[in-house]
Design a protein with these regions (language model features):
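Positively charged N-terminal leader segments that act as targeting/secretion signals
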Residues: 6-26
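Auxiliary alpha/beta "docking" domains used to position bulky ligands
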Residues: 31-176
Length: 176
């Protein structure tokens, strides 16, 4: 299992220790676990709620529906314009073999409910509470990547938080 220690400690145990970041002193890798198992443990230790893995194979089945959406004017304007880049992950990173998809849960209940009044009140969506989710997720991706770099050689990555070329929902579905 992965353990992150805030204070430097030394133990006699079946772990490898690596410096990880200023916030945490050590990244602890359990001998005998697969790289995937170590990555999952790391993800959970830095606050990633869900993590999935999939191949960097093409999403060719999306091509027809993506082109139709453009023709019918059903795009929101936030989608990446190049459909080829949306369905071929290796156009974003030619060395890609695996795509890691993460999810972080939002707080969904107020710690203290507002008092009922005669006046109507609006509600804000939970994903607008606190920091912009783009920054939160990018930070988690960067921390995950730093940990993976400590575990493996020749690691190359490109992080995307719904601003990249790939279709996020398709990646997440295939990654489980």
């Amino acid at each position: 299992m992965f353990l992150l220690y805030k204070k430097k400690k030394v133990f006699e145990s079946p772990f490898y220790y690596f410096p990880l970041s200023p916030e945490t002193s050590f990244l602890c890798i359990m001998k005998g676990m697969t790289l995937k198992e170590n990555i999952i443990q790391l993800a959970h230790s830095i606050g990633i709620s869900k993590i999935g893995f999939t191949t960097a194979d093409d999403f060719a089945y999306l091509e027809k529906s993506l082109r139709l959406a453009v023709e019918e004017g059903r795009n929101s304007g936030f989608e990446h314009k190049n459909i080829e880049e949306r369905i071929h992950p290796k156009l974003s990173l030619s060395s890609a073999k695996t795509i890691i998809s993460i999810a972080v849960a939002y707080p969904h209940k107020l710690k203290q409910q507002p008092q009922k009044t005669a006046y109507k009140r609006g509600k804000f969506t939970p994903n607008s509470w606190g920091l912009d989710y783009h920054y939160v997720l990018q930070d988690k991706l960067n921390r995950l990547a730093a940990g993976i770099e400590e575990m493996t050689r020749d690691f190359e990555y490109k992080g995307m938080v719904d601003t990249g070329a790939l279709v996020d929902t398709a990646v997440a579905q295939r990654a489980g």
